[in-house]
Amino acid sequence: MTESRTVYVRVKPTEEFAEDFVKIGEDGQSVTIKSLTKPKRSFLKHQISSYSFQFASILQNTDQQSMFNLTTKPAIDNAIGGVSSCILCNGGPGSGKTHTLNGPQNNYAERGLIPRTIGYIFQRLATQPELGITVRCSFIEFLNEQLFDVLNAFNGQPPKELKIVEAKNGRISVKNLFMPIIKDEQSGLERLFMGNALRALNPIHLQTTSLFTLWFDSDIPQPTTEKPLHTKLHFVDMASPVKFETSNRESEEFHRQASINRTMTVLERVLIATEHIPYRSCPLTHFLKDSLCNRCIIAHVSFDSESL
């Protein structure tokens, strides 16, 4: 399978769309944003009056099923076919990242990418039992350059320090990470919902980067690769970049904000690097090392007048 690097933009619905400043191209792949600031000095010339960006697609008023078909279904097929993949959602606070990934728990029609993925996987595997694929899940938070096991509360064991391990073949795993087997859609959804519920108990945790991963393993040689299967599919809910709201460099808030911004900077460097790629510069990129070659980034934006 070929490497895939795709970027989509999902626009949050609004009744106050800033049409005077934002123009989405008729092709549905480009957007032009006018500069909102006026030059302070009238004698300056050649100032940039607008910025244009190109994407695989700009998604407006797109339903959850269409989002899944376009952005996630190919990644699932890759993972089951032998290539680890990554779905990465980023955007500002309230831009809709978590809605895209999870959706409301009590509205089946609006369920997000992860619940739809779990359902699709077991529908597909039910038709191919000869593949002998076992599915596991894990749920990790990244806070202040450290990894935390969200699902460990259901492990019945005291928490242990998580350590990212890289095998000689380049495969990434996490030592001491709780990775329960999920045998069907219901058990997978239970793990996801329990993890989300635990995170919601502490508001600070909702401001961290979280990573829900599905692991696929089989000792049976697979038809696409003629090798045993050991892949993963990551869903990353990126913490939003933040402005420093405190000057106290010793405070926990300062360190948390600095960690979020540093992770975003390292991730950007990894995504644009062509030669030496600094995967080990932060835990998130190190963990995603064997999956970022096949990635789908969903950038969430709000083009309402108030946000601009």
What are these language model-derived features?
Residues 1-92, 102-293, 302:
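P-loop NTPase "switch/coupling" elements that transmit nucleotide state to mechanical/effector output
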Residues 97:
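Conserved lysine of the Walker
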Residues 299:
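Short catalytic micro-motifs in class I SAM-dependent methyltransferases
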Residues 306-308:
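Long, amphipathic alpha-helical segments that form or neighbor coiled-coils/leucine zippers used
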